[in-house]
A protein has these predicted regions:
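Bacterial N-terminal signal peptides
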Residues: 4-15
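N-terminal (or domain-start) structured segment
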Residues: 20-116, 154, 162, 178-203, ...
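Hinge/capping helix and adjacent helix->loop/strand transition within the periplasmic-binding protein
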Residues: 22, 54, 81-87, 100-191, ...
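An extracytoplasmic/periplasmic, membrane-proximal ligand-sensing/linker region
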Residues: 28-30, 175-179, 263-326
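Short hydrophobic/charged patches on amphipathic alpha-helices used for structural packing
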Residues: 76, 142-145, 193, 212
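Beta->alpha turn/N-cap motifs
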Residues: 91-96, 159, 188-189, 206-211, ...
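A ligand-binding cleft/hinge motif common to bilobed small-molecule-binding domains
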Residues: 95-107, 167, 171-176, 203-235
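Short beta-strand->loop
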Residues: 115-122, 180-185, 202, 213-248
Length: 326
């Protein structure tokens, strides 16, 4: 009788156990970290040292998968619809919140929705900078605005894609200043920077990490930042707000997973990422790019992300419909 009850109990326990219970020993195979942009951009530059540190901590390979397209929507959708088992992660940028709002604006089905993801950790967060070629006559933001107003639509800015992390803050600036620039969208941060360095555009709005080497080499110049105060590494560069323009925008990168990833897997990834951001390669890589780490653990990150996404939804509505050329 007792033996029968024990067996019955085991059968019931097995029946109600979570589907992931048999695979508690995570990770047991390589992990893919998707970057929704080509190499050389903020997401890629953030992902690679983090992946290296995670490999050592988790004792499994962590492969970077660059899956570019549609300003990040292709890679974001890939992860949103992947099996939620912890083996497909995304190094997301701020644009992950923007693109579903753009789909709504244009009345089309979204490639993904933000609630298909859960945050593991925010890695960095930085204002964007208005960056121009050093061989232009613009030494200050006033120089740039005055010239742009004299010849609307002639100055070209490149971006990482329509409504991407480099496009949205430039639209905010154009609305706040009344200038009209011509837009050259590309497929990511790397191609965007190649465009300005190659003379195909004269300006970009980007986190300083993508521009720092070229600023130090004398090829590019910083005019203003989208924060509320000067950036520590460049105290001489004023904020748009301090110059009278209502432009405030934070470019961030964070590690996220499909929303139904088992809690025990998320915990392992949270703990590992918390340790990873303290590793030398992560600290050094951010220091070289003049980008401070701005780590947030999952709970804090998800709450912050919700508020940031709400703010960006309002920004998208204010920007309105923008076509591929302006």
């Amino acid at each position: 009788m007792l033996r029968g009850l024990v067996l019955t109990g085991l059968i019931v326990a097995t029946a109600v156990a979570p589907a992931w219970a048999a695979d508690d020993a995570y990770p047991t195979r390589p992990i893919s970290m998707v970057v929704a942009f080509p190499p050389g951009g903020v997401a890629d530059n953030t992902a690679r040292p983090v992946a290296t540190a995670l490999e050592r901590i988790l004792k499994q390979p962590v492969a970077i998968i660059n899956k570019a397209g549609a300003a990040g929507a292709v890679g974001n959708q890939t992860v949103a619809t992947s099996k939620p088992d912890g083996y497909t992660l995304l190094m997301a940028l701020v644009s992950i919140s923007v693109l579903p709002e753009v789909d709504k604006l244009f009345g089309r089905p979204p490639n993904y929705t933000r609630d298909q993801f859960t945050g593991i950790a925010r890695i960095n967060a930085d204002p964007s900078m208005l960056v121009v070629r050093a061989d232009t006559p613009w030494k200050t933001l006033k120089d740039f605005v005055d010239d742009a107003k004299k010849r609307p639509g002639e100055i070209v800015f490149s971006s990482s894609g329509l409504y991407g992390a480099a496009h949205v803050p430039m639209e905010m600036f154009m609305q706040a200043s009344g200038v009209k620039l011509r837009h050259l969208p590309t497929t990511g941060g790397g191609p965007m920077m190649n465009a300005i360095l190659g003379g195909h555009s004269q300006a970009v709005m980007t986190p300083v990490s993508l521009a720092v080497a070229h600023v130090k080499a004398g090829k590019l110049r910083l005019l203003a930042n989208t924060g509320t105060a000067p950036v520590a590494a460049y105290p001489e560069v004023p904020s748009f707000k301090s110059l009278g323009y209502d432009v405030e925008y934070t470019a961030w990168a964070g590690l996220v997973a499909p929303v139904k990833t088992p809690p025990h897997v998320i915990k392992i990834l949270r703990d590992a990422t918390r340790q990873a951001v303290k590793e030398p390669e992560v600290i050094t890589s951010h220091a070289k790019l003049d980008t401070p780490l701005a780590y947030m653990d999952a709970d804090e990150f998800n709450a912050w992300w919700e508020k940031d996404a709400q703010k960006l939804a309002a920004v998208v509505q204010k920007i309105g419909k923008v076509e591929s050329a302006q």
